[in-house]
Design a protein with these regions (language model features):
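Perimembrane helix-loop-helix junctions
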Residues: 2, 152, 179-216, 220, ...
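Short periplasmic/luminal acceptor-recognition loop of GT-C membrane glycosyltransferases, typified by
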Residues: 432-517, 536-550, 592-598
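Membrane-interface alpha helices of multi-pass inner-membrane proteins
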Residues: 123-124, 146, 158-185, 209, ...
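Short acidic/glycine- and proline-prone juxtamembrane loop motifs at membrane-interface regions
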Residues: 128-137
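Transmembrane-helix motifs of polytopic, lipid-linked glycan transferases
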Residues: 86-106, 142, 281-286
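Membrane-interface transmembrane helices that cradle and orient dolichyl/undecaprenyl
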Residues: 105-107, 143-159, 195, 336-345
């Protein structure tokens, strides 16, 4: 199928320039947005993993990303948060190139580029610094690439290498252990090609041995550098927290409920929107072929529809989550249609692996699809985009037979109708991604034109936010310098690990973001911290929520009071208050967002 004229630029653009433009686009979004939580959480991990690894024990479920980040911090630590953001853009661009090379033989090149553009634009709204998800994406793409190469070329070593990458992915992000299930692609491909089961078994055995060997080797490295016991303690902690019915982020029942709820919503949104698009295509044909006045009606309807969708995005009826659901749902629906078709076995195998990642990758995350679903789209969505953009004809027939009568109806869409629908749907998807990237910087919901002020920290050079946010941070940095210095223990409570990072202080409770702890674990860590360090730390405490829909505009007033969130935090806050009272802490300074508390004397 020839590309429509509006595809011509993407179709003709030099491939190297295409990749460079995607890289530059990511870099453009690295200069704005100040996040206290996630970026500081991983940044502190990289600072402390070699010098004080026990202080970041909680992060050890992401051990390999900590090693990579720690090495980067050793050589480029002075580049701070901005440097880590550039590093993530480098890894993402590497992932884009690998996906392109993997899928190019089986997809229309223009459609593949469009799929990669949409995922890249959608990603720019999320956490920007290098962290475990960016590294995990690279590893699962390499896993699939080598596994697929092994299937095509019957190379035993490729299966082994693929298994090693699963091992590396697992120690980058523990939930990625589920990627061992990609072995299903070996049996699917073998079944479709009528390969002897004994041969399939040998292929899968090399894959499993590669995984086991990779895990064993990295555990040995952990042992050699003194990280093994800390890693085991981190795993025990995750299991312990998963058993908490009320507060645990990793409880099995909670993860299953999230899984079912998120993917059912994704399929629902995708089905409704795709059905609507079919009806639009039918309408286009009706008004295009009739009297001339119908064409005017069609033109008016087209622009009214675009304005209506834009309005829904502005008033947040269509939001970032709904867009994620749509991309996920369309990928799964395309996966089902491709697997049920008589298409190329290789493409079906790739889509099977892409859908497996799309379903399995978010499962072990504390918030499931909502937080990490975006990182699972890299294989499935470009294939889905190619599938839907290649559709030439679609029809839906209804035939109701009753004893005295028969009702028949048929919706048919083909040719020029689909071209218009595909064109505007793609434009709206890209437009929505750009809109949310522009108006909703990660946990810094402010007008970008107002985000031109920096914070007085060398680790935040090149990162700009609003004047108000910069001011409250500068006040805190200036005043806290009277009480802390690099290398001191500090408890930044409860969701502001960035402060540990920019002051190079050591997390007191073996986790720079105590909000991740449930109440019982936090209480135990407070008591254990004093026994371990014999130090009562300076405490920096935030006064209100600093992330999510209600908190991301700080220090501006919260748009609404998140009563459920504050109620859930109350038991942990109570433990904090008991600790402060027991040890006679006093408030020595505060502004509208933060307060500094100190013990009476150092013990």
């Amino acid at each position: 199928m020839k590309s429509a004229f509006w595809f011509s630029f993407i179709d003709r653009i030099n491939l190297k320039i295409f990749f460079i433009l995607l890289f530059v686009y990511q870099i453009l979004f690295t200069f704005q947005g100040l996040d206290l939580s996630d970026e500081g959480f991983v940044g502190t991990f990289y600072q402390q993993i070699f010098s004080n690894p026990e202080s970041v024990q909680y992060n050890f479920m992401f051990w390999l990303s900590g090693i990579v980040g720690g090495v980067f911090n050793h050589f480029f630590g002075e580049s701070g948060i901005w440097g880590l953001r550039v590093f993530s853009a480098v890894l993402t661009t590497a992932s884009i190139i690998l996906v392109y090379k993997l899928l190019k033989p089986y997809l229309n090149a223009t459609h593949l580029k469009i799929g990669l553009i949409v995922v890249t634009l959608f990603l720019s709204n999320n956490t920007k610094v290098f962290h475990y998800n960016y590294l995990s994406v690279l590893f699962y793409i390499l896993t699939i690439s080598f596994l697929f190469k092994g299937l095509k070329e019957n190379g035993w070593s490729y299966f082994f290498i693929s298994g090693v990458f699963v091992a590396m992915d697992t120690l980058t992000r523990i939930p990625s252990i589920v990627n061992i299930g990609l072995v299903i692609a070996i049996f699917y491909h073998g079944y479709k090609n009528k390969t002897a089961f004994s041969h399939q078994f040998k292929q899968s055995l090399f894959f499993i041995v590669g995984f086991a060997g990779g895990i064993l080797l990295m555990l040995m490295v952990m042992k050699l550098i003194g990280h093994f016991d800390i890693f085991i303690n981190a795993l025990k902690l995750v299991v312990q927290m998963g058993g908490s019915a009320d507060e645990g982020h990793y409880g099995l029942l909670k993860l299953i409920q999230q899984f079912l709820g998120s993917y059912s919503a994704s399929l629902k949104y995708a089905f409704i929107i795709l059905l609507f698009l079919l009806l639009v295509a039918v309408g286009v044909d009706y008004y295009r072929t009739g009297p001339y006045y119908r064409k005017w009606i069609l033109e008016i309807f087209k622009y009214l529809l675009i304005l209506f969708v834009a309005f829904l995005a502005v008033v947040k009826v269509i939001d970032h989550k709904m867009l994620l659901y749509f991309l996920t749902g369309t990928s799964l629906m395309a996966g089902f249609l491709i697997l049920m078709s008589d298409g190329i076995i290789e493409l079906k195998t790739l889509m099977l692996m892409g859908c497996y990642i799309l379903l399995a990758y978010p499962f072990g995350s504390s918030a499931g699809l909502i937080t990490v679903g975006i990182y699972s789209l890299w294989i499935a969505f470009p294939i889905a985009a190619d599938y839907f953009l290649n559709i030439r004809k679609a029809d839906v027939s209804v035939n109701i037979l009753e004893s005295n009568a028969q009702f028949k109806a048929k919706l048919l869409a083909e040719g020029i109708q689909w071209n218009a629908v595909k064109r505007y749907t793609t434009i709206l998807c890209i437009g929505a991604c750009l809109y949310y990237a522009w108006y909703y910087p990660f946990f810094d919901y402010h007008e970008r034109t107002d985000m031109r002020y920096s914070v007085n920290s060398k680790y935040l050079r090149g990162v700009y936010t609003t004047k108000e946010r910069a001011n409250v941070m500068n006040e805190l940095i200036s005043e806290s310098s009277k009480y802390i210095k690099p290398g001191d223990y500090l408890l930044a409570y409860h969701s502001m690990p960035l402060f540990n990072y920019i002051t190079r202080t050591v997390p007191y409770v073996r986790n720079s973001m105590p909000w991740f702890y449930n109440t019982s674990v936090f209480n135990a860590e407070l008591n254990l911290a004093y026994e371990r360090t014999k130090v009562l730390p300076v405490i920096i405490r935030q006064k209100r929520k600093t992330f999510g829909k209600s908190g991301s505009a700080w220090p501006d007033p919260e748009p609404f009071y998140d009563a459920i969130w504050y109620k859930k935090n109350a038991p942990r806050d109570s433990c904090m208050n008991i600790f402060l009272e027991k040890n006679n802490y006093s408030k020595v300074w505060e502004n509208q967002m933060f307060e500094i508390l100190t013990p009476p004397v150092s013990k």
